[in-house]
Amino acid sequence: MNKPSLPLKKRGLGRGLEALLGSKGGSSVPPTVAQEQLPGEVLRTLQTTQLQPSKYQPRREMSEAKLAELADSIKAQGVIQPIIVRELDVDMFEIVAGERRWRASQLAGLTEVPVIVRELDDRTVVAMALIENIQREDLNPLEEAQALQRLIDEFSLTHAEAAEAVGRSRAAVSNLLRLLELPLGIRTLLESHQLEMGHARALLTLTPELAAKLAKEAADQGWSVREVEHRAQQFAAGKVPDIRDKKSKSLASAPAQPDIASLETELSERLGTKVAINHGRTGKGKLVIHYTDLDVLDGVLERLRARAVG
């Protein structure tokens, strides 16, 4: 089967699906779950027991902490975005998009959830699941790379075609896919968020043995991306940097780190979602508030508004 041609300069889930599946008879591609239902579609309410996860779901694990955050938001706000499903059998439906909302709704004690039922073939369901997950904000770089590779394998895409489908640059897609070349130990550090994309990119310039050694030290010592880049350059040039030199010690023993961790925990508890504080050596930094979907974001905004009024 020939690969469908990809349209230029299109972004977003629906357009990415057009790129993968092509348009059939001018029909529109199913929209992302953030969009309103299509004309003629009816918002339905189903029992949570009538739904089951999709066999095409690429996410292997779901954070219990984040599910609990979403459950708290659903208790307060309800399920804002309907779950997209397709009918499997009489009174049984497969989740196409929204498995986290379904699981969190059950944690919140709900027995019913809002859904939109669509007629979708397997190929469309695979594409929707993969693209939606790739475009999520909370995926770590390795999960993104694995989902991209599966997308490429499922639809026999080039890197450029995959980039077009998910709204990324070709270079970004190629860089992510290179992470799959890293040794297992480094990939584990990426999955556990002990290393970031920038760290991994620097390590790709080294042999697997040197990369594994430097990755462990970087995770243990809390090195910045710039520090790892510097040391990788030294290794590549044939120099063997002292991993215990003064610069490393100053980075590893920064007194602010325990305080930063404590502040992150306090803010996360107050806002009901993950909060990260990136504190630089100059005293400057940034505060990052994570949210996994609009339900969590609404909960954060409600808490902030309540404190502002109070």
Curated annotation (Swiss-Prot):
Organism: Xylella fastidiosa (strain Temecula1 / ATCC 700964)
Any GO BP: chromosome segregation
Protein name per Swiss-Prot or TrEMBL: Probable chromosome-partitioning protein ParB
Cellular component annotations (GO), alphabetically ordered: chromosome
Keywords tagged on the record: Chromosome partition, DNA-binding
Task of the protein: Involved in chromosome partition. Localize to both poles of the predivisional cell following completion of DNA replication. Binds to the DNA origin of replication.
Listed GO MF terms: DNA binding
Domain of life, per lineage: Bacteria
Family designation: Belongs to the ParB family.
Signal sequence extent: none
Gene: parB
